[in-house]
Swiss-Prot record:
Protein name: Venom allergen 5.02
InterPro entries reported for this sequence: Allrgn_V5/Tpx1_CS, CAP_dom, CAP_sf, CRISP-related, V5_allergen-like
Gene Ontology cellular-component terms listed: extracellular region
SMART domains recorded: SCP
Compartments where found: Secreted
Stretches that traverse the bilayer: none
Annotated source species: Vespa crabro (European hornet)
Keyword terms of this UniProt record: Allergen, Disulfide bond, Secreted
Similarity comment: Belongs to the CRISP family. Venom allergen 5-like subfamily.
Tissues showing expression: Expressed by the venom gland.
Length: 202
């Protein structure tokens, strides 16, 4: 498998380690649903692009302090099935956290993850999970070296101007009586690179 040849800063590529099958690999956990529907893919993409536009136009009033400045330019994201496959294989492992190596031949790949847990079999809406990433903007100060990635890193990846493509995967499973809803989105090229600004201000 060609993914075994892809180099990352650390670890073996997710698709080399676990193979390219998108079947769940959750051990003793009971899988309720695996993967996103076409409709959910479209919703996630639309939500990202609408939020990127809002920020780029200078209409996001939240921040620390707000509002966020408008952007000189920001790519419109398109869906990428390869990024989605890599995200799905990782979600299938039911192991909440970031994988070590998820790059494609084309890009270094960034990642956002979210998990919702409910005690009953309640449906967790993917758009609410994406909204959690958007809401990190309340702690973000444009251009400040004091921003902490563990507080705002999902937001900054969402609006990283140079990112062009996105692909996501999900797993709904039961672990220790809890219903876990796990969402993984991969982004190419990756955001949150060194000291680069998330976007150039207008």
């Amino acid at each position: 498998n060609n993914y075994c040849k892809i180099k990352c800063r650390s670890g073996i590529h997710t698709l080399c380690k676990y193979g390219t099958s998108t079947k769940p690999n959750c051990g003793k956990n009971v899988v309720k649903a695996s993967g996103l529907t076409k409709q959910e893919n479209l919703e996630i993409l639309k939500q990202h692009n609408e939020f990127r536009q809002k920020v780029a136009r200078g209409l996001e009033t939240r921040g620390n302090p707000g509002p966020q400045p408008p952007a000189k330019s920001m790519n419109t994201l398109v869906w990428n099935d390869e990024l989605a496959q890599i995200a799905q294989v990782w979600a299938n492992q039911c192991n909440y956290g970031h994988d070590n190596c998820r790059n494609s031949a084309k890009y270094s790949v960034g990642q956002n993850i979210a998990e919702g847990s409910t005690s009953a079999d309640n449906f967790v809406n993917v758009s609410n999970m994406v909204k959690m990433w958007e809401d990190e903007v309340k702690d973000y100060q444009y251009g400040s070296p004091k921003n902490k990635l563990n507080k705002v890193g999902h937001y900054t990846q969402m609006v990283w101007a140079k990112t062009k493509e996105i692909g996501c995967g999900s797993e709904d499973y039961i672990e220790d009586g809890w219903h876990r809803h796990y969402l993984v989105c991969n982004y190419g090229p990756a955001g949150n690179v060194g000291n680069e600004p998330i976007y150039e201000r207008k």
